[in-house]
Amino acid sequence: MRVKEKYQHLRRWGWRWGTMLLGMLMICSATEKLWVTVYYGVPVWKEATTTLFCASDAKAYDTEVHNVWATHACVPTDPNPQEVVLVNVTENFNMWKNDMVEQMHEDIISLWDQSLKPCVKLTPLCVSLKCTDLKNDTNTNSSSGGMIMEKGEIKNCSFNISTSIRGKVQKEYAFFYKHDIIPIDNDTTSYTLTSCNTSVITQACPKVSFEPIPIHYCAPAGFAILKCNNKTFNGTGPCTNVSTVQCTHGIKPVVSTQLLLNGSLAEEEVVIRSANLTDNVKTIIVQLNQSVEINCTRPNNNTRKRIRIQRGPGRTFVTIGKIGNMRQAHCNISRAKWNNTLKQIASKLREQYGNNKTIIFKQSSGGDLEIVTHSFNCGGEFFYCNSTQLFNSTWFNSTWSTEGSNNTEGSDTITLPCRIKQIINMWQEVGKAMYAPPISGQIRCSSNITGLLLTRDGGNNNNGSEIFRPGGGDMRDNWRSELYKYKVVKIEPLGVAPTKAKRRVVQREKRAVGIGALFLGFLGAAGSTMGAASMTLTVQARQLLSGIVQQQNNLLRAIEAQQHLLQLTVWGIKQLQARILAVERYLKDQQLLGIWGCSGKLICTTAVPWNASWSNKSLEQIWNHTTWMEWDREINNYTSLIHSLIEESQNQQEKNEQELLELDKWASLWNWFNITNWLWYIKIFIMIVGGLVGLRIVFAVLSIVNRVRQGHSPLSFQTHLPTPGGPDRPEGIEEEGGERDRDRSIRLVNGSLALIWDDLRSLCLFSYHRLRDLLLIVTRIVELLGRRGWEALKYWWNLLQYWSQELKNSAVSLLNATAIAVAEGTDRVIEVVQGACRAIRHIPRRIRQGLERILL
């Protein structure tokens, strides 16, 4: 019986506690609803192509062509350039698909076209030239201290030109290099200028020097340039050391083939870069870690001669006048440095193509003179140097020794013989030729070799060797060797993310901006989590606008400082276009914020619920373990949908606010006491009184008219007419009263004012009685509601006390049952232990008793 009672008690206790736990579980399991929140100034970017502008420290007074071009096209450089390192950011780069290379290529073409603009068409010189070899009076090259030109390298040509007198011709002579003329019908004495049959030859302006200056490429506001700082970056793939800059480093636009001159060096080891190392068609770009100096000179002290070939001013052909000596132009390179460079390059190539490979460097396999030789511009003259001595070695896989002319020569200097051409095939356009006027005096230039352009022979080489030859010709590879670590991205400052905050539709409050935001740069928080990056929104949003303003100021300063030289060329139009684009993008973002009801806000809550199908991550995962870049990639497919929902929600909210404002007069009871409203109330009161008086007058007139029509004379308005009695009630005599005493007495008044006052009094009494009845009804309702509410509160209080007592009793019962069970269990354990102890203690007695029985 006792066990049964305990079982029933535990059963009741289990039901109570089970019900309570189930309710608590249902309450706790209810997930808190999330809402979309808009953030402005988030560190998010996307790959983009935009119009870049250039910056340089060009000197307006310098006539060097690069300075002139940069003065017209570029803005001054920033004296304090900033570079912000993006911590915990990994970005993919691809130097072979970089729009910056294409833009620089177009710009350098513009530079050459503008700098070497043609002054004179040489069509009159496309005639038959009678040429002979220039005699060499020097018989030895040792005494002259240099290499002697080959016989026939320079031709002395004569030709006829028109004079100022019509019908007369004049015979002139000029010196031409062998490669600038071609024989006519294999005749050794009759020649014509090369390219006369394929293009129109024009002569560049003679007053030209040619020394490239560094040019910086800058991104407009709203865009940024990402820079990869990995020291061994091969140009493609992910980069873990990323920073953001507004402008690139200074790049010298040196046009050359085979060898890259005056570029940037690798910080550690030699770096090999190629779009596909297994494809022999692709060019291999080698970046050196140590520069090799190359000194070039044209020793012969030539003079210039001018020949008028056409009527009119400026129609002058400039050619070589006198040749000081016949020493050949050449370039000198240190043999030890070059061999050390090839050794490092061969080592890196073996890492790519196999450690057991033998690396062989050979001369160019053929083609145009610009490709076969190392071509470049030195002091205004175009040099074409034979690079066979540079690329004529074999590097074995074990000894790493060399074979070829590099070791057979005993001198410490490699001397490259060079040719000079005056008729140049322009690299920027096929079929275009230009005559570069000769430069008088000696020419010397010193450059640094910072890279190589190589090509690999194709085919199946089973002999364990790889052959590499110098290449070039596509100047995009030259620019690519400097722009490999840059990419342009578009800033996307608008971001959406879920939060617990919902937009309130009450009156707006002033927004307080936190002062704990640190200056990290516009994209400095890109690697931080979303929660940490949201602290820098103020700085980033401010810098987005300040970047636009700063660039506008830079442009205005450039125009003011160089207004006498600045011309609105194609470059000027491109710069204006870039800035207008930046302003338009900023205004577009501000327009979206305005449409969403977020104008002037960095963090803007909305009334759009967050859909778990967009992202099922928890708030802790989103804000503490996710960057804005990762988050943008995750919800990129739903961004347009979220934006449209925010717009719809804002439209609905504005509609609701409009409807609420229409009821604002009823909500603001204090406005009833405004003097303007009181004047309106008095006006309404006067209109009501006037209406009542007018109705009374109308009815009185109608009554008089009615009585006159019936033959009665009009009575006073206040004449009291007796109430007619019924047919069963006799009139009686005057003395016989009784019944008439019960008739209602009516107060009679005299005068119109008294009549008006009586009507007003009746109206006020009527209003008073009705308002009193209404007030009594309202009081009764409030009293009833208060009584019912109080009873409900007392009921809920009693219910709460009851359940509290029940919970208390259940807890006490549980504790009692637990105590009883523990006590009973303890008693059983004690009894068992006592029995065991007694049994052990009685063992000797039992043994003694057994022995006694045996003995007895």
From Swiss-Prot:
GO biological process: clathrin-dependent endocytosis of virus by host cell; fusion of virus membrane with host endosome membrane; fusion of virus membrane with host plasma membrane; positive regulation of plasma membrane raft polarization; positive regulation of receptor clustering; viral protein processing; virion attachment to host cell
Residue numbers spanned by region V3: 296-330
Protein name stated in the entry: Envelope glycoprotein gp160
Covalently attached lipid (S-palmitoyl cysteine), positions: C764, C837
The keyword Amino-acid biosynthesis belongs to this UniProt entry's keyword annotation: no
Signal sequence segment: 1-32
Domain comment quoted from the record: Some of the most genetically diverse regions of the viral genome are present in Env. They are called variable regions 1 through 5 (V1 through V5). Coreceptor usage of gp120 is determined mainly by the primary structure of the third variable region (V3) in the outer domain of gp120. The sequence of V3 determines which coreceptor, CCR5 and/or CXCR4 (corresponding to R5/macrophage, X4/T cell and R5X4/T cell and macrophage tropism), is used to trigger the fusion potential of the Env complex, and hence which cells the virus can infect. Binding to CCR5 involves a region adjacent in addition to V3. The membrane proximal external region (MPER) present in gp41 is a tryptophan-rich region recognized by the antibodies 2F5, Z13, and 4E10. MPER seems to play a role in fusion.
Positions of region (V5): 461-471, 463-471
GO molecular function, one term: structural molecule activity
Matching InterPro entries: Gp120_core_sf (IPR036377), Gp160 (IPR037527), GP41-like (IPR000328), HIV1_Gp120 (IPR000777)
Sequence ranges on the Cytoplasmic membrane side: 706-856
CDD domains tied to this protein: HIV-1-like_HR1-HR2
Region (V2) residue spans: 157-196
GO cellular component labels: host cell endosome membrane; host cell plasma membrane; membrane; viral envelope; virion membrane
Chain positions covered by the region annotation V1: 131-156
Native source species: Human immunodeficiency virus type 1 group M subtype B (isolate LW123)
